[in-house]
UniProtKB/Swiss-Prot annotation:
The chain crosses the membrane at residues 723-743. Ca(2+) 2 binds at residues 184, 242, 244, 246-247. This is Integrin beta-5. Heterodimer of an alpha and a beta subunit. Beta-5 (ITGB5) associates with alpha-V (ITGAV). Interacts with MYO10. Interacts with DAB2. Integrin ITGAV:ITGB5 interacts with FBLN5 (via N-terminus). ITGAV:ITGB5 interacts with CCN3. Interacts with tensin TNS3; TNS3 also interacts with PEAK1, thus acting as an adapter molecule to bridge the association of PEAK1 with ITGB5. Ca(2+) 1 binds at residues 149, 152-153, 362. The keyword Phosphoprotein applies. Residues 25-722 are extracellular. The VWFA domain (or beta I domain) contains three cation-binding sites: the ligand-associated metal ion-binding site (LIMBS or SyMBS), the metal ion-dependent adhesion site (MIDAS), and the adjacent MIDAS site (ADMIDAS). This domain is also part of the ligand-binding site.
Amino acid sequence: MPRAPALLFSCLLGLCALVPRLPGLNICTSGSATSCEECLLIHPKCAWCFKEDFGSLRSVTSRCDLKANLIRNGCGVEFESPASSTQVLRSLPLSSKGSSPAGSDVIQLTPQEVTVTLRPGDRTAFQLQVRQVEDYPVDLYYLMDLSLSMKDDLENIRSLGTKLAEEMRKLTSNFRLGFGSFVDKNISPFSYTAPRYQTNPCIGYKLFPNCVPSFGFRHLLPLTDRVDSFNEEVRKQRVSRNRDAPEGGFDAVLQAAVCKEKIGWRKDALHLLVFTTDDVPHIALDGKLGGLVQPHDGQCHLNEANEYTASNQMDYPSLALLGEKLAENNINLIFAVTKNHYMLYKNFTALIPGTTVEILHGDSKNILQLIINAYNSIRSKVELSVWDQPEDLNLFFTATCQDGVSYPGQRKCEGLKIGDTASFEVSVEARSCPSKHVQHTFTLRPVGFRDSLEVGVTYNCRCGCSAGLEPDSARCSSNGTYVCGLCECNPGYLGTRCECQEGESQSGYQNLCREAEGKPLCSGRGQCSCNQCSCFESEFGKIYGSFCECDNFSCARNKGVLCSGHGECHCGECKCHAGYIGDNCNCSTDISTCQARDGHICSDRGHCVCGQCQCTEPGAFGETCEKCPTCPDACSTKRDCVECLLLHSGSSADNQTCQNLCKDEVITRVDTIVKDDQEAVLCFYKTAKDCVMMFTYSELPSGKSNLTVLREPECGTAPSAMTILLAVVGSILLTGFALLVIWKLLVTIHDRREFAKFQSERSRARYEMASNPLYRKPISTHTVDFTFNKFNKSYNGTVD
């Protein structure tokens, strides 16, 4: 699958190479070249015949044709057809070890100097080899964040120098160590600037009330092989305090990179810059918050006390400036950052070449192993970088890594061991000729290496026959210059021999100015003089051709741009620059833009067409078809290989089948799997014996998969029969008890609801007082009214 786009690209290039030979499509004769130089620019297969009596005296364009056609038509050997070429000027052999005292004779790249002579459109190639030699000197500068949050980290690295030197001497016999620290710019709002904080910014901070004033960067220890000096310098350090969360570490990184003499970087050594912090960095434009509008100048600003003096004068450096200065000084930057900021710094590594990132524990206890891992990672890969590439050059790379397989479009090899050699084929192609006859130079350098390859470029744009030009030649009626087999007439003269003056006309021969019978004279865009067309001038461009039938402005456009800006218009047809095809040259043949992060073209889920991925896998999308929720996951696709080769549990476990299944895998067997590896995907599946098999996979830039597999699957012990019986009985009893509890709970809830309802109805009842009509009281009361006449008295009372 990944070879398909490359094969398609090769076929397209092959088709383009055959175009001049196809009938009716001879680009050389249809280009209407009127001089040798114009002919050579049309196509690298075109040649110019400078034989005096060759071809039609009327047709100049017949001299520009394919070389085979010119020879067949009688040109002989009098033709110009230069080809691109390569010459190796200096090629010292690669070294095997780097343990010499001075290291000056250590060669890690060959050749060292090459010159290429280029004809536009004609590609030439050369090979270069890179080797990570054994026992190469190492300079390591430890740059530490000394803000208050790093207090516990400072305690844990006080003896780092001794331990680090012991481990590094297992890898190289020539190791040096340096130390520097940083906090942030000592201006508001980055630091506490009130007078009471000038000597102690920790005043009022209960957890740690005493610390040193804030500072930008301090270079504390030049690179030295005395590790006790490192330990002693670390013990002297005290933390400081800044106001905001981000730190000013990138100021320190830039100074450590450009102050070569102060730091003590050796010319012939591997340069490692370890950057430790627990927070995010300030970057360019952040300084404007503090009134710093001057961009960083990328220069060294350390005073006699080795303190950064421009901290409060210039803005923070940009990522582009950092990458440029680190690359100029061959420095590999190692970000040692806490886990919560890992992804941010991981994104930085894509913008700063030669940079790696490792996860630092909160107390820096893993810093030793972190540095060793980063060193091994750096030494296991080689990546080419290009410096000062001329704008009119195209470069094409093909990498051949340790597996011996060629990978077109790749300029990086990973998974190398010390002593392995990576080979690269570099093809160079000129798109056009420079306006002036100049020689360009560009440099190829592996990232982080001192060694480089200087490539000189000369352009083969002039014809050798031009050296024999004859001004006012008798061959040109003394009215022009004879050069390369034809006459270049002086102003006012026309004709193949400059025998006529402009304005002269012979009506009997005007048909010589017609392209075909019935066609207008000079295609209606010129004047027939001396039986030859003199083309009009146009504000849109140039009109040319024997019959003024051609121009350089009537070609297809893309978004209003002629030939998309990637080609030249010749006689109504776009002649595309190298690297572009199509009617309007809008289709790029560069497949690097289709390369996914894993190194595969369109993530193996599509084709690269005109520099863009067209996803063919159902459900795949993204710029490189990297997203595909419905695609079979990689764990499933790698399982057959793991089963067949390591577990022998596949349906066909013979060696040949396993080799076919695992042809694109690099397999490592281990006893334990690292489950929190940020660079790999953790996979696991259940075997036929109910065991769990785990493995991790990651993609190498070469296109292969790196599989790390357990030696044996993890199997649990089978439970006994008594355990199963007790579990079943216990579950039954527990279920019954649970059901009883639920039933009792439901009954209780129901009773409580009924009682509450009764109480509610009872409280709403009302009663009135009444008497029984059948009830009579035992006591009756009567009223008697009588008069005692005898005494003349009366009595009105009650008698019981």
